[in-house]
Each structure stands twice: as C-alpha cells, then as structure tokens.
Amino acid sequence: MSEQNNTEMTFQIQRIYTKDISFEAPNAPHVFQKDWQPEVKLDLDTASTQLADDVYEVVLRVTVTASLGEETAFLCEVQQGGIFSIAGIEGTQMAHCLGAYCPNILFPYARECITSMVSRGTFPQLNLAPVNFDALFMNYLQQQAGEGTEEHQDA
C-alpha cells in the first residue's frame, strides 16, 4: 500500500479567538423609548486561509442588524476565528470542512459574543437560532455548479 492510502484524517482545534468585534447603537438613546418590535437581519460569511502545511485559519463573520422601521436600533458584528490542524482530506471534503464543519464549531462562540454585546447595549435579549452550515455549504456548491453550467452554455 502506498503512504497516501494509509493517511488518516486528522482534525484538531488549535485555537478559537475573537478576531474583531463591533457594536453600534446609532439612534440611542431615543430608540429605547420606542415600542420594541425590531426587524432583525442576520448575515453570515466565512473565509479560510492556509497558514502552514495542514494548518488553516477559518474566520466566521456574523453581522446582526436590528431595525425599528427605517431606524437602525443596533448593528453588531463579530469575526470569530479559529486555527485548525486538518490533514488527510482534500478537494470537496476539505472545502466542506473549512466551509461548514469549522464554522459550525465557531458559531456558538460568535453567538455568545453577540448576545453579550446586545445585552451590554441594554437592548432586550437576542437569541440567535442555530445555523445549518452544511445546508448553506450545499447551497453554495449548487450555486457554483449552476454558474459553471451557465458559463458553458454561453461559450
């Protein structure tokens, strides 16, 4: 057997850290006197960078915007980072690991940070629902495949 066939998949968390946080309440204090029926918008984004052989940084960016009508009550952004050792996988499996599995690990940390900042801003508690990063990753792959098909049709 070749050495490649004996390569076992390994995954290890080296570090989880807060890379950047931001909280803005541009319409405070008068926003506190309004009836609290916000429209809450959640945006997610991930990025990964190879730091060394089998070592990757994954950053999950979570942005929450709460609006009352046309006014922004608060805007909260967290970039939660992680450094992971990943070996023994390639291609689509590696893309899935970096684009779904690692963000799944990082999300609870980002959610806790956002909840804390919103609370410190004296807004009512914000509970973010769990996110299915596997489904988001599959949607991303389908979009990429669709764009590739369209490019071939245009050629």
From Swiss-Prot:
Domain of life: Bacteria
GO biological process, one term: protein transport
CDD domains according to UniProt: Translocase_SecB
Coiled-coil regions listed: none
Pfam families to which the protein is assigned, alphabetical: SecB
UniProt KW Transport keyword: yes
Cellular compartments annotated: Cytoplasm
Matches recorded under Gene3D superfamilies: SecB-like
Keyword Cytoplasm attributed: yes
UniProt GO cellular component terms: cytoplasm
GO molecular function, one term: unfolded protein binding
Protein keywords: Chaperone, Cytoplasm, Protein transport, Translocation, Transport
InterPro entries the record matches: SecB (IPR003708), SecB-like_sf (IPR035958)
UniProt subunit comment: Homotetramer, a dimer of dimers. One homotetramer interacts with 1 SecA dimer.
Role: One of the proteins required for the normal export of preproteins out of the cell cytoplasm. It is a molecular chaperone that binds to a subset of precursor proteins, maintaining them in a translocation-competent state. It also specifically binds to its receptor SecA.
Family of the protein in this entry: Belongs to the SecB family.
Name this polypeptide is given: Protein-export protein SecB
Organism: Escherichia coli O1:K1 / APEC
